[in-house]
A protein has these predicted regions:
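Serine residues within intrinsically disordered or low-complexity segments
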Residues: 4, 9, 22, 27-29, ...
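Bacterial N-terminal signal peptides that target proteins for export
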Residues: 28-51
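Acidic, metal/ion-coordinating pockets
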Residues: 40, 62-377, 381, 435-447, ...
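Bacterial N-terminal signal peptides
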Residues: 50-59
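Catalytic centers of hydrolytic enzymes
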Residues: 76-79, 88-89, 95, 103-105, ...
Length: 620
């Protein structure tokens, strides 16, 4: 059963009010019955009776789980499918991932819920567009068209929703005539579901942004249950996209914003509230949702869940970090499902038919999208595998949607002609993307320095979005690695300033600095991290040396915090082209074969530092 959208007045939410609402919500939540009940099924393949303990206002009691026939009369199931960080990954690769396959899985789930009187809710947690030619050549239009057909109920606005900037080829405004959010607003206007942004604040009004079809929250009807959905984005949003496209915006704290908006939704009649949060975490084991030992305990979405008053938010669809989550934190189910259209998350909310409130929940591991599966392990199998069987889900074979394929076809055809263009170069060994120093990261930095003719290049590991396979270089492969339309910038740093920039990055989490033209050795001394720099020929860089540095407009504007230790930046020049285009031109003129061993070995690192990031020098 599809969720049907329902118009509502969101109420006035000021930034000042969001910060002050926590105590009010905490007291109100005591009056919300039935929201603190939790049930986890320990093993879905060996169902057995479980004991459910219900905490109510005046007394606690325990009862045996109802029989299936009684459950059918008294409860219904709302299955929530959560996606995030599609990044334009609309297509399957070798029978894995893509929106046509997602539609096949969702159709099977909808059929299952229709048969038992429940419903399905499809929610996205942001970063829908940026990342592939299929999406970027039309500024995300193809993603919205496919999401409309899939029947999404809502999508959060993530940091990369701002990447396209104004409508047209430029990624940032050229002048006052350009709306820095033009492309985002156009995509929202095309959507048959709302874009949610409760904590993205217009500084001129101190209220959440109110662009056409962009709002803090929505209420939808799922099998007769009024479900509220609140959208929020990571506190790092403004430093994780183009600064020119977020001028005049602020990000309100996530937990107070969620609490305030969820309370308003309940006052407006929602009996279930879900958060769609472009904020994430990382877990690696999914057998037991209550076991958090494989999860990073201090991750943003876990801090948010623990800060929420009990019973205000029933569940969270998370994203941003590109990792899996299928866990319960502070009594709240949280799911997240990697990136690039690889998988989806799911939790089932068991809802009392009379009260409309959640009585229990089930959390499912991230589900990979597969056309075929291994008959023994049921894991995804290659299409070419002779023993693979068609995948099944909810007791039915999964069939990729021909309707979705037809929607994607024009964008796929347009991208194909661009992707196939050969460049004058070859990659000898597969190069993998990581958030540590890598051969691929060093190669991208080398390309950027060579293209700009600079002394040094500074890039960021977060800007590298795909592995680079062995074989001939094509524009499509280069584009997959560097999909952002960041402009090539040059600026001047002294040796002392560059040392400061590198030391700062090594002492923080997040995107790693990528360098070309110098090698940095860092060591702790007297409680400080001290960095020594050498030029590639071996000469030490002095504090007063002036270096011409190639970088991107994203980093020059403070992105990822890499260049923020130096302010103001000097001699900044826009070189008039996109970084990727400059690299492609240079490869075409100076092409050769690149080997991994030339770019990184244990003895030939560009960043040498004690331990792991973030480096701490105050430890004994």
């Amino acid at each position: 059963m599809y969720a049907s959208a329902e118009r509502r007045s969101p109420g006035r939410t000021t930034l000042r009010h969001v910060w002050a609402v926590s105590d009010i919500v905490r007291s109100m939540s005591r009056a919300v019955p039935g929201l603190l009940i939790t049930m986890l099924e320990e093993h879905r393949r060996t169902p057995r009776p479980v004991v459910v303990c219900a905490l109510v206002l005046t007394a606690a009691s325990c009862a045996r789980q109802s029989t299936p026939s009684a459950d059918r009369r008294s409860t219904l199931t709302v299955s929530v499918v959560g996606t995030s960080d599609l990044h334009g990954g609309v297509l399957a690769e070798d029978g894995r991932g893509g929106l046509a396959l997602l539609d096949g899985y969702v159709r099977n789930l909808r059929a299952a819920r229709q048969s038992d009187g429940g419903g399905v809710l499809l929610v996205d947690a942001g970063d829908m567009f940026q990342g592939t030619l299929e999406s970027n050549l039309n500024e995300g239009q193809v993603v919205v068209a496919a999401y409309n057909a899939l029947g999404y109920a809502a999508a959060a606005v993530g940091n990369h929703e701002f990447d396209y900037g104004p409508i047209g080829d430029r990624a940032t405004p050229a002048g006052p005539q350009d709306d820095p959010r033009g492309a985002l607003k156009s995509r929202a206007a095309e959507a048959r579901f709302p874009f949610l942004a409760a904590n993205i604040i217009d500084e001129s009004t101190e209220m959440p942004v109110r662009w056409p079809n962009v709002q803090p929250s929505t209420i939808v009807d799922v099998a007769g249950v009024r479900v509220g959905i609140v959208g929020v984005t990571t506190s790092a949003t403004l430093s994780a996209t183009m600064a020119a496209n977020t001028v005049g915006l602020a990000i309100a704290p996530l937990a107070p914003t969620l609490a305030a908006e969820a309370t308003r939704l309940r006052a407006s009649g929602a009996t279930v509230v879900i958060a769609s949060a472009h904020a994430g975490g990382r877990c690696t084991a999914f057998e037991n949702p209550s076991d958090l030992s494989s999860c990073g305990g201090d991750e943003e979405i876990f801090r948010v869940a623990r800060a929420l008053p009990g019973g205000v938010v029933d569940a969270i669809v998370a994203g941003h970090r590109h990792f899996g989550i299928a866990h319960e934190v502070a009594g709240i189910p949280i799911v997240s499902s990697y990136s690039g259209g690889r998988a989806f998350g799911r939790f089932d909310l068991i809802v009392d038919r009379q009260t409309g409130r959640v009585t229990s929940h089930r959390i499912f591991p991230p589900r990979d999208l597969c056309a075929t599966q291994d008959p023994a392990t049921r894991a995804c199998a290659r299409l070419s595998s002779g023993t693979a069987l068609p995948s099944d889900y909810e007791g039915r074979p999964v069939a990729a949607s021909a309707d979705i394929d037809r929607i994607l076809a024009p964008a796929v055809e347009r991208a194909r002609s661009v992707k196939g263009r050969r460049l004058n170069g070859r990659i000898a060994d597969p190069l993998r993307r990581t958030n540590e120093e890598s051969a691929l990261g060093n190669l991208v930095a080398d390309w950027a320095r060579a293209a700009a003719g600079a002394d040094v290049a500074i890039a960021n590991s977060g800007g590298i979005r795909a592995d680079l396979p062995a074989g001939p270089l094509t524009f499509g492969r280069l584009y997959a690695v560097t999909p952002f339309d960041n402009r090539e910038m040059t600026l001047t740093l002294t040796g002392e300033e560059l040392r400061r920039v590198i030391a700062n990055n090594l002492q923080h989490r997040g995107s790693l600095i990528l360098i070309s033209g110098v090698r940095a050795t860092a060591a702790c001394g007297s409680g400080e991290l001290r960095v020594t720099l050498r030029r590639d020929p071996g000469r030490t860089v002095t504090d007063t040396d002036r270096l011409r540095v190639a970088t991107s407009d994203f980093l020059a504007a403070g992105g990822d915090g890499i260049l923020t230790p130096v302010s103001p930046l000097r001699d900044v020049k826009d070189e008039g082209r996109v970084v990727r285009d400059g690299i492609a031109d240079w490869i075409q003129r100076h092409g050769r074969t690149w080997r991994a061993a030339e770019l990184l070995t244990a003895e030939n690192r560009r960043l040498t530092f004690p331990g792991t990031r973030p480096v701490r020098c105050d430890r004994p």
